[in-house]
C-alpha cells in the first residue's frame, strides 16, 4: 500500500480548519443576531451616566511627578525602581540561597529595550546603563548600612 503524500494531509487538515472557522462564523452571526434582538427588547434604563472607577496606573502626564520639587540635584532619581522599598526587602528575604534577585529589574528591562530599539548600539543607551548602575549602587549601600534588614 502506498502512503498518502504530506500535501494530501495538509490539504485535508486545512479544509477541516476552514470548515471549523465557517461554522464558528455562522455561530457568531447567530449569537450577534440573538443578542441584538435581546438588547432591543430590553427596555431597562442603562447606567452609562456613571463613569467607571479608575483602576491601574496614572496615565495623565500632568499628574505624574517626574522630578521632585527640590533644588538639590542629589535628591533626583533617574530610574523607575526603588531598591530600598520594603517589598524588595521582603522578596530578597524570601528567595532561595542559590537564586538571584534584582531590585532594579525595571531599569534592567529598560536598558535591554533600548538596545533592541537601537540595533544594540551601546553608545545610544548609555543613560539607561548609568541609571541601572545608580540603582544598583543605592541598593548595595542600603544593604551595607542595614545588613540585618536584608537577611
Swiss-Prot record:
Gene3D superfamilies for this protein: CytochromE C oxidase copper chaperone (1.10.287.1130)
UniProtKB keywords: Cytoplasm, Disulfide bond, Mitochondrion, Transit peptide
Disordered: annotated segments: 1-86
Cellular localization per UniProt: Cytoplasm; Mitochondrion intermembrane space
Cystine residue pairs: 104-135, 114-125
Motif placement: Cx9C motif 1: 104-114
Polar residues composition-biased segments: 7-18
Pfam families attached to this UniProt entry: CHCH (PF06747)
GO terms (BP aspect): mitochondrial cytochrome c oxidase assembly; mitochondrial respiratory chain complex assembly
Other facts: Present with 1360 molecules/cell in log phase SD medium.
Cited function: Required for the assembly of cytochrome c oxidase.
Protein name: Cytochrome c oxidase-assembly factor COX23, mitochondrial
Gene from which the chain derives: COX23
Amino acid at each position: 500500500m502506498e502512503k498518502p503524500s504530506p500535501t494530501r494531509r495538509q490539504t485535508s487538515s486545512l479544509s477541516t480548519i476552514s470548515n471549523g472557522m465557517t461554522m464558528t462564523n455562522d455561530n457568531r452571526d447567530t449569537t450577534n443576531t440573538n443578542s441584538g434582538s435581546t438588547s432591543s427588547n430590553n427596555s431597562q434604563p442603562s447606567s452609562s451616566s456613571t463613569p467607571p472607577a479608575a483602576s491601574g496606573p496614572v496615565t495623565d502626564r500632568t499628574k505624574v511627578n517626574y522630578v521632585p520639587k527640590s533644588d538639590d540635584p542629589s535628591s533626583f532619581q533617574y530610574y523607575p525602581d526603588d531598591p530600598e522599598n520594603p517589598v524588595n526587602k521582603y522578596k530578597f528575604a524570601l528567595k532561595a540561597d542559590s537564586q538571584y534577585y534584582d531590585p532594579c529589574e525595571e531599569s534592567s528591562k529598560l536598558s535591554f529595550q533600548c538596545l533592541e530599539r537601537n540595533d544594540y548600539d551601546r553608545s545610544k543607551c548609555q543613560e539607561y546603563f548609568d541609571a541601572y548602575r545608580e540603582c544598583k549602587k543605592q541598593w548595595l549601600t542600603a544593604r551595607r548600612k542595614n545588613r540585618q534588614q536584608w537577611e
